[in-house]
């Protein structure tokens, strides 16, 4: 069975050169049949997306800005995410900082927690929900920085070679 199965492949795709030997053994093919093509879902990260055009379409009333930050915490089955988990968190201080630095902060929560962002929203803090972007992966490259915890979104964002902050 393995011989018949493995002889029918022209090539097998993988995401990195390090996986070539493993994939070759797993599919019982020679390493030259393994091609590194990355993750198709990340193709959008390598396109030239116009940040102002995309955000302008999603949020027509945005104030002037120079930098954009995406805050994407992980969904937790055991309770609602606390978006700003600091005892000394000060909403007014965050808004003043964003205003002073001419920045926008976009909060992206799991679809089950969309209401949790409401108390934090304002002129420079916006909610980027499924209504605006069903899959945020294709537009990750429009953000200048990512803030997350242990969400796997950071793995895709690594491809942008931009700063990340882990909470």
Where are each of the predicted segments found?
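A short beta-strand/loop micro-motif in the catalytic core of glycosyltransferases
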Residues: 10-16, 104-106, 146-147
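Alpha-helix capping/helix-boundary segments
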Residues: 18-19, 113, 152-153
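Nucleotide-activated donor-binding/catalytic signature segment of Leloir-type glycosyltransferases, i.e.
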Residues: 113-131
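Acidic, amphipathic alpha-helical patches
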Residues: 2, 94, 136
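Active-site and donor-binding regions of nucleotide-sugar-utilizing enzymes
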Residues: 1-46
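Conserved catalytic-core segment of nucleotide-activated headgroup transferases in glycan assembly
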Residues: 40-119
């Amino acid at each position: 069975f393995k011989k018949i199965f493995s002889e029918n492949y022209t090539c097998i795709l993988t995401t990195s050169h390090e996986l070539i030997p493993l994939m070759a053994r797993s599919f019982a093919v020679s390493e030259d049949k393994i091609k590194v093509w990355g993750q198709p879902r990340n193709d959008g990260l390598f396109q030239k997306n116009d940040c102002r055009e995309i955000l302008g379409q999603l949020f027509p009333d945005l104030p002037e800005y120079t930098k954009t930050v995406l805050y994407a915490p992980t969904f937790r089955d055991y309770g609602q995410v606390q978006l700003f988990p600091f005892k000394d968190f000060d909403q007014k201080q965050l808004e003043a900082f964003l205003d002073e630095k001419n920045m926008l902060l976009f909060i992206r929560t799991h679809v089950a927690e969309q209401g949790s962002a409401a108390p934090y929203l304002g002129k420079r803090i916006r909610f980027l929900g499924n209504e605006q972007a069903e899959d945020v992966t294709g537009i990750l490259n429009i953000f200048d920085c990512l803030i997350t915890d242990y969400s796997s979104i950071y793995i895709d964002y690594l491809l942008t070679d931009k700063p990340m902050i882990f909470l």
